[in-house]
A protein has these predicted regions:
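Histidine- and acidic-residue-rich, metal-dependent catalytic cores
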Residues: 82-318
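Non-catalytic interface/linker regions that flank or bridge core catalytic/transmembrane domains
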Residues: 1-128, 132-133, 317
Length: 318
């Protein structure tokens, strides 16, 4: 069994499980040590400066399990979701080029699995509706963006990764907005909204010089809150000038926000969210992309209304 255990990360490990209660070195940075042997200790400690190394190690282990063909697709997707959450947590703490490149690997793994396993499409669609609303919203928006991009005909994996990165990074500018505004459990006042509306420009400034991100990804971060009739923000540009990636992220953002549990609102079922978007938020989204989003969840646009029952969801590999 021990031979099949994964290698340990290059960190020194200590234990307090000693008679005098003082830390005792279990393993030097590069010393071979059995992972199975560690299970003999109730708690293993590392130095604070090694925390990032251990986080990267855990992320890579989780990520690798997400592409193992011998695992059920549900388990692979759950592994990728966990890796994505770890990556995004680091990204919001430090939106550095290094952390953005790490996030790109996670998005690439989602796309890789989606393009090779028809079942992954259905699991992804369900996955995006069940994350609590914190950093996970960025992961959900990335997932929805990838799904919608594939649905409308994107087949090149690098394009889908760019779309997914746009979804993942769309709210990165909120690192520059006061936490009390971000976490307010109710409606924002005019001053707070004025601050919140700065996040697309802040986000664009953070990522504009990162060479591994494409121009269309960067513009999606800037433009995802533009609207029809030049009523959006930050630049109130004509709707025809808003990029396709930006429009994909806009609808993915809204849909994921509505279908995710928040401190002040219950998560809506996909059908309920689509009805609300159609009836109340149509000025914020592209009509053709909305039609495709409806089809993803097995419905017909003409069947969406505030009354009656939701249409039966079809299982499709598209």
């Amino acid at each position: 069994i021990d031979l099949k255990m994964p290698p340990l990360p290059a960190v020194a490990m200590f234990t307090y499980d000693t008679k005098d209660g003082k830390p005792e070195l279990l393993r030097e940075y590069d010393q071979p040590y059995s992972p199975l042997a560690l299970t003999a200790y109730p708690e293993v400690l590392i130095k604070l400066e090694d925390l990032k190394v251990l986080q990267h190690y855990a992320e890579q282990r989780i990520l690798s399990s997400g592409v193992q063909k011998n695992l059920p697709v549900e388990k692979r997707m759950e592994s990728l979701r966990r890796a994505a959450l770890l990556s995004v947590e680091e990204l919001f703490k430090d939106p550095s080029p290094e952390n953005i490149n790490r996030s790109r690997k996670v998005v690439g793994s989602f796309v890789y699995l989606l393009m090779r396993d028809p079942q992954a499409y259905l699991v992804l669609a369900r996955l995006s509706s069940h994350d609590p609303y914190t950093l996970q919203h960025s992961v959900g928006a990335a997932v929805n963006s990838i799904i919608l991009g594939k649905k409308i005909g994107f087949r090149n994996e690098s394009d889908l990764i760019d779309i997914g990165m746009a979804g993942l990074l769309h709210d990165i500018g909120k690192v520059g907005v006061a936490p009390e505004i971000i976490n307010k459990p109710g409606p924002l006042d005019d001053r707070e909204w004025s601050e919140m509306r700065k996040h697309p420009e802040i986000g664009y400034e953070i990522i504009k010089d990162i060479p591994t991100l494409t121009g269309v990804t960067k513009m999606a971060v800037l433009e995802h809150h533009e609207e029809k009739h030049m009523k959006g923000y930050p630049n109130k540009i004509p709707w025809d000038d808003v990029g396709l990636y930006s429009k994909i992220v806009a609808i993915a953002d809204i849909f994921n926000a509505l279908t995710t549990e928040r401190s002040y609102s219950k998560a809506k079922e996909p059908y309920e969210a689509l009805v609300l978007i159609k009836d109340k938020l149509s000025n914020k989204i592209d009509d053709e992309l909305f039609r495709e989003m409806v089809m993803i969840y097995g419905g017909q646009l003409e069947g969406l209304s505030g009354a009656g029952t939701a249409p039966q969801q079809k299982e499709t590999s598209e």
